Amino acid sequence: MTIAFELSVFALITISFLLVIGVPVVLASPDGWSSSKNIVFSGASLWIGLVFLVGILNSLIS
């Protein structure tokens, strides 16, 4: 169970880093938002899911 928690925290940190770097780049590019809107929303949905997963796993571990 601890391994799953650690991997989900690592995935959350990785997705957070990618969103922090990627979203401003997408918004700054001239045609970026209209062509990459689905990717940004998918990343945000994945991030929200990982936040809930980390919270659930944390409550099971401690």
Curated annotation (Swiss-Prot):
PSII is composed of 1 copy each of membrane proteins PsbA, PsbB, PsbC, PsbD, PsbE, PsbF, PsbH, PsbI, PsbJ, PsbK, PsbL, PsbM, PsbT, PsbY, PsbZ, Psb30/Ycf12, at least 3 peripheral proteins of the oxygen-evolving complex and a large number of cofactors. It forms dimeric complexes. The chain crosses the membrane at residues 8-28, 41-61. Disulfide bonds: none annotated. It is a multi-pass membrane protein. Its main location: plastid. One of its GO terms (biological process) is photosynthesis. HAMAP family: PSII_PsbZ. This is Photosystem II reaction center protein Z.
